[in-house]
A protein has these predicted regions:
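Active-site pocket-lining/capping segments in soluble small-molecule metabolic enzymes
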Residues: 1-135, 140-172, 197-303
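Conserved catalytic-core segments centered on acid/base and nucleophilic motifs
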Residues: 138, 186-192
Length: 303
């Protein structure tokens, strides 16, 4: 098998374990997903204050395209005031469109990809529209879109200070793939919720970018609950975004006012789960440091 090791060396995925951190020296940050609009963001911030914890990033899944400009501004302002990154999914995707492929048994894996040049153009416009209202962080789930937005930045069509977060729906399952995503310009990458510590260590050794990991994942992503493992996950994967989904929760994509109460209730419980996980971390590894609000490297909104 020596020849396999030589191939891995050329690919650059056999690096030694190393201690790494965020730009502020912290080992981990907390992320609350499915924060679908201003009211849900308010619920997260209230819950974080009540629980006495810091949320560093919120992310959204329905797409920036389903929010009014005023709602984008409200989310940007709330995130800026709280020192929280607001990461919005790029809206257009195959499972929202007219084709049947993404709704078939074999095509579901392609559901968050962007189909055709017209939808890719809409996706780019969705990013530009959100940046005009102050958003500086986006979820992408399509390789072509990631390449296109990076080119748009290089040409001056999009701001240079944007964070590109690879979605869990495009999670890489080996170090070579996560390294390719880093080379394409991803800023952070969501990896599968069920990775073992050994697999997490392999990915960490291959790349320097932050890894995003569901400590608790929603049922469509496996329904994993690992709150007691947070310390091990951080020690192995730092710099790590510890992401708190919610098992046994109603699916809400695409969300809206009709599901706002559910989204707020889910978000509040996610913050509670994060607080529980932090107690486990403090019990087992009290020296692990979390980023403060507004820390360097966050894709904070702008006015």
């Amino acid at each position: 098998m020596r020849w396999v090791g030589e191939v891995f060396d050329v690919l650059g995925v056999t690096g030694q374990d190393h201690e790494a951190s965020f730009p502020d020296g912290a080992a981990f940050r907390l992320e609350i997903p499915s924060v679908e609009g201003p009211r849900v963001l308010e619920a997260v911030l209230r819950a974080a204050e009540a629980e006495g914890i810091t949320v560093n990033r919120v992310s959204q899944g329905s797409g920036a395209m389903l929010l009014r400009a005023s709602e984008l501004r409200d989310m940007a302002q709330a995130g800026l005031d709280a020192g929280v990154e607001v990461c919005l999914f790029v809206g257009p995707r195959e499972r929202f469109a007219t084709g049947a492929h993404a709704r078939s048994a074999d095509g579901r894996a392609h559901g968050d990809q962007v189909r055709g040049l017209r939808q890719l153009a809409y996706a780019l416009e969705d990013v530009l529209r959100a940046t005009e209202e102050g958003i500086r962080s986006f979820l992408v789930a399509d390789l072509g879109l990631l390449r296109a937005v990076r080119l748009a930045q290089a040409r001056g069509a999009l701001p240079t200070d944007l964070v590109w977060k690879v979605s869990a729906s495009m999670s890489p399952t080996n170090p070579v793939t996560v390294k390719i995503l880093e080379e394409l310009g991803a800023g952070t990458v969501n990896i599968p919720a069920d990775v073992t510590l050994d697999e997490l260590a392999e990915m960490r050794a291959a790349v320097s970018l932050p890894l995003d990991l569901y400590v608790e994942s929603p049922d469509p992503l496996g329904g994993i609950v690992r709150v007691q493992e947070l310390a091990d996950l951080v020690r192995t994967g730092a710099p790590l975004y510890a992401k708190f989904g919610l098992r046994n929760a109603q699916a809400i994509y695409p969300s809206g006012h009709h599901l706002e109460a559910v989204a707020c209730a889910n978000a509040t419980e996610k913050v509670h789960r994060a607080a529980v996980a932090l107690e486990w971390l403090e019990r087992l590894s009290p020296g692990l440091v979390q980023s403060k609000p507004g820390a360097a490297g966050l894709g904070l909104p702008v006015r």
